[in-house]
From Swiss-Prot:
The keyword Membrane applies. The chain crosses the membrane at residues 3-23. It comes from the Eukaryota. It is a single-pass membrane protein. Glycans are attached at residue 41. It is found in: Membrane. Residues 24-124 are extracellular. This is Putative transmembrane protein ENSP00000320207. The keyword Glycoprotein applies. The lineage of its organism: Eukaryota, Metazoa, Chordata, Craniata, Vertebrata. Keywords: Glycoprotein, Membrane, Signal-anchor, Transmembrane, Transmembrane helix. GO terms for cellular component: membrane.
Length: 124
């Protein structure tokens, strides 16, 4: 009984991860990005977060247009509207930046002009 419950939980976790990766890769096209500007605006806290029952390590960047970038350990990053989450990232967590909605500010528009493919970042 315990083995079948563990197997089903593991299988559902795998299915959700695959589904999220599929959505990110095929429905969220790359946008413009400036990694130095993003790293400068890094914010992190210690509040735990979970999505669909899965524990994620997330990071958020705050921008003038109110968009945030969400990241999870082992999965591509996703750009979503809303306030940036404040979560603790473990050292060594690999972050893949996959999509970004650039801010409209004239101050940053020139810096946010490079086309994004994939940028990786390792939390130290």
């Amino acid at each position: 009984m315990y083995v079948s419950i563990s197997f089903l939980l593991g299988l559902s976790h795998l299915v959700l991860c695959c589904l999220l990766t599929f959505i990110v890769n095929f429905y969220l096209p790359p946008e413009s990005i400036d990694f130095e500007f993003m790293a400068h605006n890094w914010s992190k806290g210690r509040s735990p977060s979970s999505t669909l029952g899965l524990s994620w390590f997330k990071a958020g960047f705050r921008f003038s247009d109110g968009w945030s970038m969400f990241y999870s350990s082992g999965l591509p990053g996703v750009a979503l509207p809303g306030s940036p989450p404040r979560s603790h990232l473990l050292p060594g967590t690999q972050i893949l930046i996959r999509s970004f909605q650039p801010c409209e500010s004239a101050k940053h528009s020139a810096r946010l002009s490079s086309l994004l493919t994939t940028t990786s970042y390792s939390v130290s």
